Amino acid sequence: MAEITSQMVMQLREKTQVGVLDCKKALAEAEGDLEKAIELLRKKGIMKAGKVKDKVATEGLVGSYIHTGGRIGVLVEVNCQTDFVAKGEEFQQLVRDIAMQIAASPNVEFVSVDDVDQEVKDRELAIEVQREDLLSKPEKIRAQIAQGRVDKLFKERALLEQPFIKDQSISVGELITQKIAKIGENIKVRRFARFVLGEGLEKEEKNFAEEVAAQTGSV
């Protein structure tokens, strides 16, 4: 597997105006071939999406989803650039899909890994570095393993990193990128809230035998 250097990533970024992470993924998939990486970005619609991702998105929808039985509910705000797009079926279906995704993702806490404060990341890294299974390893190796674990931890909690429930071959972030390329406007998930019935409440625990006895009048 070809080594992907920061210089290669920046070169691809300059040519395509695509984000660093997408450039790195494309280069890895293309085994370091710049032209193949550009072609991959084109095929995935990422190049087209990259041109509008920095544009301000202040329109959109607040979508909701209530799971069958009414035990789980979701509210999510998804922004786009124009009211015209917000009223379109393509965008509205995307919002519904994202709300359903959040309902099905109990571990998700934030939209993107970028939303996590560096202080929180540093604190988790400090904890991981001191794990007992790493203490015997060389400092450099220990730091690399710890960083990998922390990255994995936050990715598991980020909405955009989750495999899309309707197509596990892409992430939620990649789904949104595809929609940006198709619709031609910037789209961003701004915030969300997930509600679970009874979450945080302490249920009264009863002795089953005593409860039955009380109901039958034998106590």
Curated annotation (Swiss-Prot):
Keywords, comma-separated and alphabetical: Cytoplasm, Elongation factor, Protein biosynthesis
Q: Which CDD domains does UniProt cross-reference here?
A: UBA_EF-Ts
Q: Establish whether keyword Protein biosynthesis is in the entry.
A: yes
| Family annotation (InterPro entries) | EF-Ts_dimer_sf, Transl_elong_EFTs/EF1B, Transl_elong_EFTs/EF1B_dimer, Transl_elong_Ts_CS, UBA-like_sf
Q: Which Gene3D superfamilies match?
A: 1.10.286.20, DNA helicase RuvA subunit, C-terminal domain, Elongation factor Ts, dimerisation domain
Q: Which GO terms describe its molecular function?
A: translation elongation factor activity
Cellular component per GO, a single term: cytoplasm
Q: What does the UniProt entry say about where the protein is found?
A: Cytoplasm
Involved in Mg(2+) ion dislocation from EF-Tu: annotated segments: 82-85
Q: Does the keyword rRNA-binding apply?
A: no
Superkingdom of this protein's organism: Bacteria
Q: Where does it mainly reside?
A: cytoplasm
Alphabetized HAMAP family for the sequence: EF_Ts (MF_00050)
The similarity annotation says:
Belongs to the EF-Ts family.
Its biological purpose: Associates with the EF-Tu.GDP complex and induces the exchange of GDP to GTP. It remains bound to the aminoacyl-tRNA.EF-Tu.GTP complex up to the GTP hydrolysis stage on the ribosome.
Entries under PANTHER family matching the protein: ELONGATION FACTOR TS (PTHR11741), ELONGATION FACTOR TS, MITOCHONDRIAL (PTHR11741:SF0)
Put simply, this protein is called Elongation factor Ts
Organism, scientific name: Gloeobacter violaceus (strain ATCC 29082 / PCC 7421)
Taxonomic lineage is: Bacteria, Bacillati, Cyanobacteriota, Cyanophyceae, Gloeobacterales
Q: Which gene carries the instructions for this protein?
A: tsf
